[in-house]
Amino acid sequence: MACAVGAAPRAQNPQRTGEGAPTGLLMGVIIDPLDGQPVPNAEVKLGGAPPATPNPVVLADDEGKFVFMGLPKGIFTITATKPGYADGAYGRLRPMGLPQAITLGDGERLGDLKIPIWKFAAVTGRVTDEAGEPLIGVAVRALQRTIVAGKPKLAPGPTVTTDDRGIYRIPSLTPGEYAVVVPSTQASAPDSIIDLFLKQRMTAGASKPGESDISRDLSFSGATEQLLAIERHRGTRVGAQSFVSSGAGSRGAVAPSPSIGGGRIHVYPTQYHPAAPTAASAAILTVRSGEERVAIDIQLGLAATSLVSGTVKGPDGALMAALTLVPETDDLASDTGFETATTLSDAAGRFTFIGVPEGRYRLRAILAQVPVSGGGRRGAPPPPPQGLSAPSTPPVPVLGGFTLWATQSIAVGASDINDLAVNLRAGFRIGGRSEFVGALAQPAPDVVRRMSATFDPADARSLVSSIIGRGQFDERANLSSYQLLPGRYYVRVNNPPVGWVLKSATLNGRDVSNVPLPLDADVTALVLTFTDRPSTLSGQVQNATGGSDPSATVLVFPTDPGGWTDYGDFPRRLRAIRVDRNGQFQTANLPGGDYLLIAIPDESSANWQDPRVLRTLARLATAITLGDGETRSATLKTSAVPR
């Protein structure tokens, strides 16, 4: 491999030149990549075209052909969609792969474009009980295996229900890797809470002075769907509670009905194909374009369960909160929403989980509230005393609302648990100020107010609410947040002023922009530094004979293996860049640091973020150091990925 330093070309936007109408043309055909045959009647869309460009969406003809005419010079993309197929794009060489840009010169006419689209796959099988009898109307779900923050995860996919033979069929699967599951969550809630919830739904909110608005109070705790599921399926009464087995994360779907025998409730716990109680032990199926996998059967078995009861208290006493139980060791499915059991505490803080099988669990309790519009909720700073103005250099503002949380491990055996104490604590806030360092004029107050921040968990877990995970800037560019759960976070800035990019996030003299910020107490002194000198990395990819390689994808990742995991959902230092049709690539705004670069066939890049893959690629990659605000270029040769 070679790595040459030089100037980086700049991307061009579509524009008209000269006096006449533009005459550029893009023409091609939609194909099935398995056999190369044309696919007729797909919808084809042109991206990057100016608003005046005629017909940016066309329908391919019966031979799969399409054409866009009257185009100015510029950079374009082409995508294709058709029922029964995964979306395709020019330059996409694998399902869900990166598209490729097309650089069109003034008056240039390109007529050899091929757009692949892949047929959906399907999975079918039968769900039976312990006696081999079919289970009817039961939710079955596909979960796609992905790499998130450097670790394998299962992402929720389509849900179907079994027919009167217990047979299911999950269509419309993008080719890839999947687990198949019959999810089952034992959801319960106090009748007093359900009655109040239903009454308020009919009267559009709290109906008496001082009465709690259940929907408002629980909307940021994930409990509204739980109450709706219990109402929808008319749950079984157990004491002063209503209880239902529901297909977790599947609106309107149900799990097999529980039974009561020997004084204990028996339920069908979540089960993965072929006979796995957890996602970590599930079989992973690989489905290819157009393939239908059959006999993916799942047999369920009843499990005896126990009740888990106790009291929730917050800093000011007993309160109503949402509680969940998840298996303690099943990290692969930690974000699928497949809780073993959920419940709510009543106004006195009392709660009961119903239908909990034996095992070890993590109990999580949450109560989060965010003001609908500004003003005085818990945690908001008080106004200055009457007759006094605010200080000229006010402290970092604090957003209203609050987040109370608890998490603890519990072991459930054959006997009920009756006296569990759950003590909620307040979450933590992130605050700080911003500095704009560069030759450009300082951004105006109304501009910096339009910035926002995202607090990205290092392990990419879902936050209790996306709203709580957002931060705001005031007119002085001071950052404030809602209360967050403890953990490790990256601070990502959205919509910075034009010409400025985030350079660093410093806390106590340490740059935490590229390492997760541990949040175990309020942070008030974060300094976000913006620069008007963004870095740029560009170059050329060649094949084995020295010609340009348009089939390559360039990967950029840190030299330090510590940066290959726990980098959140929006990593700054890992990039996959699809080269253009001339084998050229470019990316901007990489933080300064030491990187590895490698070009590989795009077909081989599906799981490139797996640390095991990166470890292999690191031995073949080119090392490069990128300084703050530096422009570098590199010439790479495509490397085959070792099996």
Please give the residue ranges for each predicted region.
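Long luminal/extracellular ectodomains of secretory-pathway precursor proteins
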Residues: M1-R643
